[in-house]
Amino acid sequence: MPTQPQEKRSFLQFLKSFVGIVRVLQILLGAGLWVTIAANKYEGSIHFVLFVAVLFWLLTLAIFILTLLDKQDLVPIVGGERWLLSNLIHDVVATLLYLSTIGIMIYKTQKNSYCNLDVYKHHCLYKVYLTASVFACLTAAVYLLSGIYCSCRKCRGERTVV
């Protein structure tokens, strides 16, 4: 029985930490992006945006759960002492791919800006793409913030994420 309060404290300690808050934001903003796109008609390069959003949403969810449960030692090759470096690489790659999704979403938003008029009566994806652009920008910013934080911890010689 004495281990349960420590586990709860560990959960709360992680959830209240900078990394815990950032991971929750990454999960929520990433979900907002792919739900916004998936709930509407999409074509062409938007498939790549959806792929990046869903891929990193799933990876971030897995990293969040493993870190929350303190089970990163069970992950072969990238776990244990390499967990901080693995998180750093994940965040940097996510930031870079999200930057490309921002470009795609801004291009699509500008391409559909003609239908933002009151007299235009057909289905318009301008507001959907604009919302997705905002989600992509916010998500990239949060991944960048997390990457900077992990790199600072790595440079100081620390080996844990929290």
Curated annotation (Swiss-Prot):
Disulfide bonding pattern of the chain: none
Domain MARVEL: 14-155
Keyword Ribosomal protein belongs to the record: no
A Gene Ontology cellular-component term: membrane
Record topology, Extracellular segments: 39-47, 108-127
Main localisation: membrane
GO terms of molecular function: structural constituent of myelin sheath
Residues annotated as transmembrane: 18-38, 48-68, 87-107, 128-148
Topological region Cytoplasmic: 1-17, 69-86, 149-162
UniProt xrefs under Pfam families: MARVEL
Record's bilayer topology term: Multi-pass membrane protein
Keywords: Membrane, Nucleus, Transmembrane, Transmembrane helix
PROSITE patterns linked: MARVEL
Record's subcellular location: Membrane; Nucleus
GO biological process: myelination
Xref: PANTHER family: MARVEL DOMAIN-CONTAINING PROTEIN 1 (PTHR22776:SF28), MARVEL-CONTAINING POTENTIAL LIPID RAFT-ASSOCIATED PROTEIN (PTHR22776)
Name assigned to this protein: MARVEL domain-containing protein 1
Species: Danio rerio (Zebrafish)
Gene from which the chain derives: marveld1
